[in-house]
């Protein structure tokens, strides 16, 4: 009897092996708390230090420096602490990269790029990242995670997924719905609407299909529920079973374990 792996089409590019949860933390207090939890549970989830929404206006440099220090700290035992930089239209995105790569590049598992409006936007930031890596003498290329949360990014999601260096496509539900200026109701930002509204479901299908075809990990948006573990688990189950997402964001420690349980094969 031949094993199924010997006769079934194996696909093209294999997926990167990533933890099932990407946990976002915007302040140093929350970053440290997440690191403590990661030490207790093990590297079953990534931590992303948020230098976009987490940084106060005028304090972007200090915030990026703080995030780099957290990444380089002894508390980071598993080297699974990444960072999200500002978007390509923001004045500080290059500075974010220079600080993060210059101070913590050797331990950065990924950098997340928010709000691109095209594949060209993503390419600009990847090219700059590679240039900074060379300037810093880094002997590796840091993987990139790309947020799909604009009309333009969704339109070019297949091109984005195929860009060298892209490791994950992340759906930004809130900004995507907001970008429709009321045409999609607010109820589509939470369950069950986020799985049932045709325009949102279409976006999730496009992102997952492009990612899976290109050997990239599709990451689902956060759930707004923070306390009801069954609700959280069900959101993750629907993302995994109905839409093919292999990873999901969390914004509260309570969300991590239910998502991990739901994302298991």
Q: Where do the protein language model's features map onto the residues?
A:
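Expand to "…catalyze enediolate/carbanion chemistry for C-C bond making/breaking, isomerization
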Residues: 1-265
């Amino acid at each position: 009897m031949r094993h199924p792996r010997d006769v079934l089409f194996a696909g093209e590019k294999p997926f990167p092996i990533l933890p099932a949860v990407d946990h976002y933390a915007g302040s140093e207090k929350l970053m440290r708390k997440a690191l403590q939890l990661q030490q207790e549970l093990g590297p079953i989830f990534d931590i992303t230090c948020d230098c976009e929404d987490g940084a106060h206006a005028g304090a972007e440099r200090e915030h990026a420096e703080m995030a780099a220090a957290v990444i380089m700290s002894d508390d980071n035992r598993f080297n699974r602490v990444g960072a999200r930089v500002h978007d390509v239209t923001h004045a500080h995105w290059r500075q974010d990269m220079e600080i993060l790569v210059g101070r913590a590049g050797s331990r950065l598992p990924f950098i997340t790029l928010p709000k691109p409006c095209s594949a060209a936007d993503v390419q600009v930031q990847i090219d700059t990242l590679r240039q900074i890596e060379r300037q810093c003498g880094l002997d590796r290329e840091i993987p990139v995670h790309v947020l799909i949360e604009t009309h333009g990014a969704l339109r070019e999601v297949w091109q984005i997924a195929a860009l060298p260096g892209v490791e994950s496509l992340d759906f930004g539900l809130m900004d995507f719905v907001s970008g429709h200026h009321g045409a999609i109701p607010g109820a589509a930002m939470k369950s069950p609407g986020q799985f049932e509204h045709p325009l949102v479901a279409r976006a999730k299908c496009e992102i997952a299909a492009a990612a899976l075809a290109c050997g990239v990990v599709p990451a689902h948006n956060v759930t707004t529920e923070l306390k009801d573990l069954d609700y959280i688990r069900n959101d993750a189950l629907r993302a995994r079973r109905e839409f093919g997402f292999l990873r999901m964001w969390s914004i509260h420690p309570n969300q991590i374990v239910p998502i991990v349980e739901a994302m298991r094969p």
